[in-house]
Amino acid sequence: MNVIFSLASFVKNMYNASLNQRNLISLPFNFMLNFAPVFIWLSIFKRAGLIPIRLRPDIHSKFAFFADQFLFGDYWHELTVQLPDNTSKLFFWSFISSSAFLLVFLICIPFAIWYYIYYIKHVNYNLLEWFANIFHYPCKRKQRPIQKRFRTIFIPFALPLFTFVILNIDHFFAYQSDANFTKTKDLLAWFSYVILHLTAPILTAVYLYVFQPPGTLKCFSFALGLQNIAGVLTHLLVPMASPWFTHLYGIDDTEHVNYTQEGFAAGLIRVDSHLGTHLNTKGFHMSPIVFGAVPSLHSAIAFQCFLFLVSRSTSLKHRFSNAGGFTMHNNDSSTFKLSEEDSEDEGDNSIPPTIGPNDLEMEPLGTVEPVDISNERSSSPSSSFTVSSNERSTGGGDGSIINSNGNKKPLQFVHLYDEDTNFTNKWIFKIVNDGFIPKFWAILYIILQWWATMYLDHHYRFDLFVGVLYAMTSFIIINWFVLQPKVLKKWIHIRLGDKVDTRNEARTFGMRVFCGTKMEWFFDPLA
């Protein structure tokens, strides 16, 4: 009976946490609204075949091939096969141009931008993680300067180089030869290219909904939809051929470069033979966009999942430990200021205004003092956050600031629960506490997906790289204008007690389900 009662209570908590002050009518409507960009992309893709051929632009059947060879190197001797008359010169220049591309565009330019931002302009916060100290760094551990931290450098400055290196490693193992094709590899590539392509965004969305602040999932949906809409419009406006087309018909073919050309499943035909079906073959024959190689939306979708999993997964910081002594003290000026004008009166649930380039005066959140403004705003429990230049210079070295009475007031979050350290320090939670699992699966998935697309002969490295650029651009836009200023800042205000939580948004979905239990900390990114 106890098991049945516990199961029933869990189901009830899941139901209530899912609705969260909504009803069964508004919940589906809210879901449709949040995922509207994704539905718009799917609608455009499905109806692309209705566009009259006379209105469509010319097909660029050679561009992706040459861009791949001269930007990433001709390791498969493709130029020798397709253009045997100029083999030696083209092979030499492919490595000269790819080396120049690597050095100039993937190393020097990102390094110059990083140096300009952090050493010339002296920006003292993570450009893409305004609240990095709050979400990602242990409270009592001394940190390196913000500009030298791995999180600051890796996203976005080192990502192009990371992509180039991994793509070429994957390219080596995806060589198009019968000797390289095996049943195991075929099925693994099919699983990644088809199954994970459909399920990974869903699993990422579930993770963000369960473990992250309300609104994070909407940002993921909008970032995904924005990049995919831009991608499918690029397919329609600048159509390019996939590698299977070049390998099947040759680089100089013109007969099949037209909009009546049927799609081709390429390496997935081998999977059909293994499984005894024709699903992949028939599915690609009916594709409404045959010449939609650049950008690769398989790469863009996988990379968007990667970006959100890597950037949002957090480690355990013992902020709400029942052992005491775990007060948040940040010793550097690397976290975005929750300014006075962002504080709201009781009952005011408006979203903080969008932060623009002219508003980027950063203050250390760990040195912001809660100021009692009850005399200024009648009967308001809210607090205002403000740090003047004088306060900045007189701040305590431990991350607190010294007020007029000479007292230090460290930043304090509202305790929604107390973490049982005897429970959270068990060996079973060690890997989870470091936030390692989401990052590991994100990296593994993107590496596997890039390999699968090349192994199945569906995309060049160039296609995949452009897909990464689309994903990064979409992520930066949504992160800058929505996620950081409108979602995370608002949520931190609520957790600080500065904003009244009238919509039960202080807790994540997982926290609501396990509210009052020993597992609540597990779903709290601030814990």
Swiss-Prot record:
<dbReference type="GO" id="GO:0006676">
    <property type="term" value="P:mannosyl diphosphorylinositol ceramide metabolic process"/>
</dbReference>
<dbReference type="GO" id="GO:0000139">
    <property type="term" value="C:Golgi membrane"/>
</dbReference>
<dbReference type="GO" id="GO:0016020">
    <property type="term" value="C:membrane"/>
</dbReference>
<feature type="transmembrane region" description="Helical">
    <location>
        <begin position="289"/>
        <end position="309"/>
    </location>
</feature>
<feature type="topological domain" description="Lumenal">
    <location>
        <begin position="46"/>
        <end position="99"/>
    </location>
</feature>
<feature type="topological domain" description="Cytoplasmic">
    <location>
        <begin position="121"/>
        <end position="152"/>
    </location>
</feature>
<dbReference type="GO" id="GO:0030148">
    <property type="term" value="P:sphingolipid biosynthetic process"/>
</dbReference>
<dbReference type="Pfam" id="PF14378">
    <property type="entry name" value="PAP2_3"/>
</dbReference>
<keyword id="KW-0812">Transmembrane</keyword>
<feature type="topological domain" description="Lumenal">
    <location>
        <begin position="241"/>
        <end position="288"/>
    </location>
</feature>
<dbReference type="GO" id="GO:0010507">
    <property type="term" value="P:negative regulation of autophagy"/>
</dbReference>
<feature type="topological domain" description="Cytoplasmic">
    <location>
        <begin position="1"/>
        <end position="24"/>
    </location>
</feature>
<feature type="transmembrane region" description="Helical">
    <location>
        <begin position="100"/>
        <end position="120"/>
    </location>
</feature>
<dbReference type="InterPro" id="IPR052185">
    <property type="entry name" value="IPC_Synthase-Related"/>
</dbReference>
<feature type="topological domain" description="Lumenal">
    <location>
        <begin position="457"/>
        <end position="461"/>
    </location>
</feature>
<feature type="transmembrane region" description="Helical">
    <location>
        <begin position="153"/>
        <end position="173"/>
    </location>
</feature>
<dbReference type="GO" id="GO:0016772">
    <property type="term" value="F:transferase activity, transferring phosphorus-containing groups"/>
</dbReference>
<feature type="transmembrane region" description="Helical">
    <location>
        <begin position="220"/>
        <end position="240"/>
    </location>
</feature>
<feature type="topological domain" description="Lumenal">
    <location>
        <begin position="174"/>
        <end position="190"/>
    </location>
</feature>
<feature type="topological domain" description="Cytoplasmic">
    <location>
        <begin position="483"/>
        <end position="527"/>
    </location>
</feature>
<feature type="transmembrane region" description="Helical">
    <location>
        <begin position="436"/>
        <end position="456"/>
    </location>
</feature>
<feature type="transmembrane region" description="Helical">
    <location>
        <begin position="191"/>
        <end position="211"/>
    </location>
</feature>
<keyword id="KW-0808">Transferase</keyword>
<keyword id="KW-0333">Golgi apparatus</keyword>
<feature type="topological domain" description="Cytoplasmic">
    <location>
        <begin position="310"/>
        <end position="435"/>
    </location>
</feature>
<protein>
    <recommendedName>
        <fullName>Inositolphosphotransferase 1</fullName>
        <ecNumber>2.7.1.228</ecNumber>
    </recommendedName>
</protein>
<comment type="function">
    <text>Catalyzes the addition of a phosphorylinositol group onto mannosyl phosphorylinositol ceramide (MIPC) to form mannosyl diphosphorylinositol ceramide (M(IP)2C), the major sphingolipid in membranes of S.cerevisiae.</text>
</comment>
<dbReference type="GO" id="GO:0070916">
    <property type="term" value="C:inositol phosphoceramide synthase complex"/>
</dbReference>
<feature type="region of interest" description="Disordered">
    <location>
        <begin position="331"/>
        <end position="404"/>
    </location>
</feature>
<feature type="compositionally biased region" description="Low complexity">
    <location>
        <begin position="376"/>
        <end position="389"/>
    </location>
</feature>
<feature type="topological domain" description="Cytoplasmic">
    <location>
        <begin position="212"/>
        <end position="219"/>
    </location>
</feature>
<feature type="transmembrane region" description="Helical">
    <location>
        <begin position="462"/>
        <end position="482"/>
    </location>
</feature>
<dbReference type="InterPro" id="IPR026841">
    <property type="entry name" value="Aur1/Ipt1"/>
</dbReference>
<feature type="transmembrane region" description="Helical">
    <location>
        <begin position="25"/>
        <end position="45"/>
    </location>
</feature>
<keyword id="KW-0472">Membrane</keyword>
<keyword id="KW-1133">Transmembrane helix</keyword>
